[in-house]
Amino acid sequence: MVQHSARFLQIVDDARSRIKETDVDTVKQRLDRGEKLFLIDVREESEFAKDHLPGATHLGKGIIERDIEERVPNLATELILYCGGGYRSALAADNLQKMGYRNILSMNGGIRGWRDKGYPLTHG
């Protein structure tokens, strides 16, 4: 597991104070109920290529702010962001809210939490 610096954790905690989070179990339950979720994987492209949540779209943290308006023009669309553990997705969620998106959730635990539960992944 990656060891994060105190300063990085400080900005993540700051972002988390302004965003809404969900967890892997809630996302899985919603998918099992047949809900159509807009899942965005904000990890690096190489991480996404290895595996990702079924149906997820890739918009890496480095480009999401640049490309989101073209991909998701409706600011009210519910978006569930995830990354490796929930840190990068919290930062990205905070930025999207600053851009006017009103229905953003960051999945706490990220794909590691999803994987640890044995939930299905798409490979490749």
Task: Name each region found by the language model.
Residues 1-38, 45-78, 84-124:
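Rhodanese-like catalytic fold shared by cysteine-dependent sulfurtransferases
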